[in-house]
A protein has these predicted regions:
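Long, contiguous juxta-domain segments that are non-catalytic but functionally important
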Residues: 74-124, 129, 134-145
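Histidine-centered divalent-metal-coordination microenvironment in nucleic-acid enzymes
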Residues: 90, 127, 205-239, 309
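A short, contiguous, amphipathic alpha-helix enriched in charged residues
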Residues: 177-209
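Mobile, glycine-rich extracellular loop/lid and propeptide segments
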Residues: 193, 213-215, 221, 241-245, ...
Length: 453
């Protein structure tokens, strides 16, 4: 019985492929799926797209030179990548997101993608900001033994779980996650003030001499608390295009970061007679990006930092804490889920707090699966480097150029004299078993850019 259940999906895939082959659709479907880059959860669209040339002298609309109808495509629909960054939801799209994040971070460290190469000479640091403690948890200290008396192996599921769940402050842990993005926003304000203070400048004068640029990602620790990894850079007043002032240094930047992290705070609610104020934890790590120790004796290089940050860009709470990668509809769903008891308590706490009127703006029930955190996992300042949107557009332009290279030049109207009429409607999501198998066969390989960091 077990064998039949295991082979059932493969049998359905083979039947789908056989049907497509008998209709003569298989070669065309392969070409259509290749454009998804291995995405197994694409958006399906119904509709059409028509191109008409325009006479630039009379403005007259000519007959259609191209027409694309979704129903004429091998899959019966136009298929669009889901672009989900979560590796647990779509490994192929998450891998593309990781590579794009790697390129984005790298461009801000050594130039490229429209960012000047001189940024490599600007003061740059790699900083990690953590959450405060909500109670003792199982860990692997330098002494080798946890406070519970056990020497835990690196892969034990107990790591990050409370020594005493009944006294662990789950409410504070969830509320800190919910306010983490606000703390970061306050930190960036204080950082500019602290840098200006050390340079002997006022806030207004600082803007005329220098600019702080950064890129950061959020990561969950095993205890379920969010912390931030960030590349922070000191530029001239116009960003990476201008050299930083003579007083700018990695040492000054490091000192300013530590000072700003100590005072940055976000006001919280009043619960059970307790007024909350949230700040970063005391464990703050700031390292200049140059020939310095990073981890295990390796150098803190541009490539290592970019790979380290990109690695976490595709992970959510489900990867580290064993929780969910989708929102809950009902709290009763928890009873059926195979998740850790610690994650279950964090989710339940967020759900219960979400019912309180004074916490309505935090939308804790909508973000219970994220343990309260509702911020963006990857953010950056405008002048740090290129954008993910620009990288996606460059990739789309390249694919379009490749597809049009086989079309005779005189058969296509110039882009600026063509009217495009398009109408698309949502038709569903996902692939059939056969389509899924073919798409997975064209997924991008992992373990390339910076994957070893």
């Amino acid at each position: 019985m077990t064998t039949t259940t295991t082979q059932a999906p493969e049998a359905r895939a083979l039947r789908d492929l056989a049907d497509l082959a008998s209709l003569g659709h298989l070669p065309g479907l392969v070409r259509q799926l290749q454009g998804l880059g291995g995405c197994t959860n694409p958006i399906r669209l119904d509709g059409h797209r028509t191109e008409h040339p325009i006479d630039t002298t009379t403005g007259e609309l000519g007959p259609a030179v191209r027409h694309l109808a979704a129903s004429d495509l091998p899959a019966g629909h136009l298929l669009v990548r889901c672009n989900n960054r979560r590796a647990t939801r779509c490994a192929a799209c998450a891998e593309t997101y990781r590579r794009d994040t790697y390129q984005l971070i790298t461009a801000g460290l050594k130039g490229g993608k429209g960012t000047p190469e001189q940024v490599a000479t600007h003061p740059r640091v790699f900083a990690t900001f953590t959450a405060p403690s909500s109670g003792p948890v199982h860990n692997r200290p330098a002494s080798g033994r946890c406070r519970c008396g056990t020497q835990h192996p690196a892969d034990t599921p107990e790591l990050g779980t409370p020594l005493d769940p009944d006294t662990y402050d789950y409410e504070t842990a969830v509320l800190w996650n919910a306010h983490a993005s606000k703390i970061w926003a306050r930190f960036t304000i204080y950082l500019r003030r602290e840098v200006a203070k050390r340079a002997g400048l006022t806030q207004r004068e600082f803007a005329e001499h220098a600019r702080v640029s950064f890129a950061k990602v959020a990561e969950y620790q095993r205890r379920g608390a969010v912390h931030f990894h960030a590349v922070i850079r000191l530029d001239g007043p116009d960003g990476g295009d201008t050299p930083p002032p003579h007083w700018a240094s990695a040492e000054l930047l490091t000192d300013a970061i530590r000072a700003a992290a100590r005072v940055a705070s976000a006001p919280g609610p009043v619960l059970h007679g307790r007024a909350y104020t949230f700040m970063f934890g005391t464990q703050l790590d700031v390292r200049p990006i140059r020939s310095a120790d990073f981890a295990g004796g390796t150098e803190l290089t541009d490539r290592a930092v970019a790979a380290y940050i990109a690695k976490y860009a595709t992970k959510g709470a489900e990867t580290t804490t064993g929780t969910l990668d989708r929102p809950l509809k009902f709290l009763a769903e928890l009873a059926q889920l195979r998740i850790s008891e610690h994650a279950r308590r964090m989710i339940r706490t967020a759900w219960i707090l979400g019912a309180r009127p004074e916490l309505e703006d935090l939308r804790l029930r909508a973000w219970a699966h994220m343990l309260g955190f509702r911020g963006h996992f990857s953010t950056k300042t405008r002048r740090y480097s290129t954008t993910l949107g620009a990288l996606r557009q460059a990739r789309a332009d390249w694919r379009r150029a490749q597809s049009e290279s086989t079309v005779p030049a005189d058969s296509t109207a110039a882009e600026d004299t063509t009217l495009v009429l398009a109408h698309w409607t949502y038709a569903g999501v996902g692939l059939s078993r056969g389509e899924e198998w073919l798409s997975a066969a064209h997924a991008p390989a992992t373990g390339l850019e910076g994957a070893t960091a």
